[in-house]
Every structure is written in structure tokens, then in C-alpha cells.
Amino acid sequence: MASLRKTHPLLKIVNDALIDLPAPANISVWWNFGSLLGLCLLTQILTGLFLAMHYTSDIATAFSSVAHICRDVNYGWLIRNFHANGASFFFICLYLHIGRGLYYGSYLYKETWNVGVVLFLLVMMTAFVGYVLPWGQMSFWGATVITNLLSAVPYVGDILVQWIWGGFSVDNATLTRFFAFHFLFPFIIAAMTILHFLFLHETGSNNPAGLNSDADKVSFHPYFSYKDLLGFVVMLLALSTLSLFSPNLLGDPDNFIPANPLVTPPHIKPEWYFLFAYAILRSIPNKLGGVLALLSSILILMLVPILHTSKQRGLTFRPLTQILFWVLVADVAILTWIGGMPVEHPFIIVGQVASVLYFALFLVIMPTTGWMENKALKWN
């Protein structure tokens, strides 16, 4: 008789996705980040739920409610540190996951990839509205600067900004709705993750060789379930270490000052994981142009499958494009650094060069190199 996990309508879905799933035998540690992102999402939802039990979304009490969580709630300080640093780990895993997809040509599963880009945008939106909630100086001014960008939209810009603010400035209505959005989005992300999963399981996983692996599959459990478990332990250990020993390392000291609309912080900047996009935004001396560049810096990922020119899938056997991939990684690192620097010489020009290179790599240099490699191999 077949076991219950293979016959029960609900358990059968779990079985086909996590137990008897045929997975390529040669997938490396770079394939761990999908499950790590799932763990991050679960951690964020759980810690966020406990924080929401004690938080008040009112400008008079928001800042002190966060202080109350850290001082008076049992292990509130730990929950808050896990939640704040969990966001950083979420983005670390996200960038590594996207980097893996770019390196090994996983983007050729177009539906999975595009749902992934939408997920990326949703996570960014969630992190942005979440950063506003403690109602510190950087929360307030970050919200003011970023929401103000919508005023660059022709004709309806100003109306749009006031509609999002719920008034004529970032105020109580803004904080309340941002809290509502921050609570809602993770559940939308969870639903989209299931969709991401669904599309992935239509095709099966890619692998480091970029070849069809139907002839060489192993079951997900126990092989990759234990491999993922090791990743969980490593990530939770790193997150715990950061949260317990240096919880404010990645935060901004200005956010320990309650929001004051009359005093602007000397340098308004977002959290580290948005700095590369912020640098691209700032490198264009035009409001609408900057906003379009900011959007394009993320949405360009959707063009990657269309711009794939090589006859090979991944970069495993393509040394020229490999170099360009690492140039892209270095370029994003430079943009991240520039995003945290003041707008002055030489940072302005470095940011502009790095921004041009970022788009050039995706749109021109990598597709051309892929085509050249085909020519060199006489695969035209």
C-alpha cells in the first residue's frame, strides 16, 4: 500500500515539492539561497508579528513604543534586533540568489525569473515602508525624500505624492498606512513565493553545467533537505552573532533621534541594501531622469533573458563573460559605497561612471561578448 504522503491530497503536494522532488545531483551551495530566503521570510513574519503586538502606529507614540519594546517587553530587544538584522540577511540572500541566477543562466526559465523580479520589488517596498515605522530622523526624512520622487511623474506627480502621504507632508496618516502596508506585503510575498515555486517545478532546477540533468537526478530528501539544513544553521548562527554582538552595526545612528520635521539630517541615505539603486538615482542631475534610472536599475533584470545571445546557458565555460560578471559585482559594490557618500567631488563622477557601466554591462557589453564567444567557437 502507498504511504499517506503519496496519497493524501495535501501531503502529496508537500511530498512532490520537498521529499520526492527529482533534483539535479550536481547543484552546488549556490542553490541553497532559495530555501534560505524562505527561512528569512518566515523569521521576518514571526518576529514582525510579535513586534506588531506592542507597536503603535501613531507619530506621538511610535518612537517610544519601539523603545518600550526594547526595554520592557520580554526579549523585545532580541526580537527587534532579529527583525532589523533579518532584513539585512534577507537582502544578502536575495542578492546572492539573483547573482547565482545571472551566473548560471537560470533566467532562461522566464516565468520563474520574472516572478522573482516582482518578488524582489515587493521585498524592497516592504523594507522601505518598514524602515519608516520606528519614526526616527532617518525614517522620517527617508520617507520624505523617496515618496517625493513620485512628484517627478508628469502632470499627476504632486497629486500622487499627496495621495500617498494622506496630507501635505509625511505625517500621522502616512505612518498609519505604511504600517498597514508593512503588515500586508509579507503575506503577498509568501503567496508570490508559492507562484515562484510553481513555475520552477514546471521545469525543474537548473544546474552548474547548464545541461539537461534528466539522466542524473536524486531525490530532494534526504540529500538536499540536509544540505539546506546546514545552510539554515550557518545563516541563523551569523544572524544571531550580528544581532547579539553588534546589533546596530548596519543601522543609522540618526534613527536614535525622534523624527523632527524642522531638522534635516546632514546626510539622508537609505539602509545599505538600497544604496546601489540610490547611487544610480543621484547620479542623474534631473528628477524624472533619476527616478527612471532607479526603476530601470531593477527592471533591467527582466530584459536579461531577452538579451541572452550565447549558445551556452551559464558562464561555467565562458571565461570572457565570467570576467564581465565579476566586473558587474564590483560595479554594484562601488555603487553601494558611493550611495553612502556625500554628493561632492570625486564621488559624483565615480557614481556616474559606475551607473553608466552598470547599464552598459547588461544592455551592450554582455550580449556582445556572448555573440563573440559563439563566433570564436564557430557556433554561429
UniProtKB/Swiss-Prot annotation:
Taxonomy, superkingdom: Eukaryota
Cell compartment(s), UniProt: Mitochondrion inner membrane
Cofactor binding note: Binds 2 heme b groups non-covalently.
Cofactor(s) required for function per UniProt: heme b
Membrane topology annotation: Multi-pass membrane protein
Function: Component of the ubiquinol-cytochrome c reductase complex (complex III or cytochrome b-c1 complex) that is part of the mitochondrial respiratory chain. The b-c1 complex mediates electron transfer from ubiquinol to cytochrome c. Contributes to the generation of a proton gradient across the mitochondrial membrane that is then used for ATP synthesis.
Protein's name according to its UniProt entry: Cytochrome b
Species for this entry: Zeus faber (John Dory)
